[in-house]
Amino acid sequence: MNKPVDLPLPAPAAVVGASLPHESAHLHVTGAAPYTDDLPEFVGTLHAALGLSPLAHGVIESIDLDRVRGEPGVVDAWSARDIPGANECGAIVKDDPILAGESGDTLRYLGQPVFVVVATTRDAARRAAALAAQVVRARALPPVLTPQQAHAARQY
């Protein structure tokens, strides 16, 4: 009933498996390709950077954003409480926090975003965000290292 059939393939199928140069390969290898960092900035451009969790697992005790806001070039800084609406995102189930949260909330992994800082230059934003280890006070929790521990703690 079902027999293999050789169907004629349209011309684009002939390129499958063929070695073809990228359309901008010549520009890349000669150093002439334009990159985002090479483009001039618009007047008034602001730069954002994330302040990241200094702990892999812990409970936030406080976040001192006033210190971050006082850094040179910083326009403002925001934490989870400043997000209007839900602080969750996710491809299917919206259960991943955008920012870690506030006092009493759990830090889930090292480098989890805790706050966002906006500044007049990229360097100023990054310098202020790097203060996370000093401005995010958190109490460390025991690590959860095995699937059995995660199941017992209902951490899925």
Give each language-model segment a name:
Residues 1-156:
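Flexible, low-hydrophobicity surface segments
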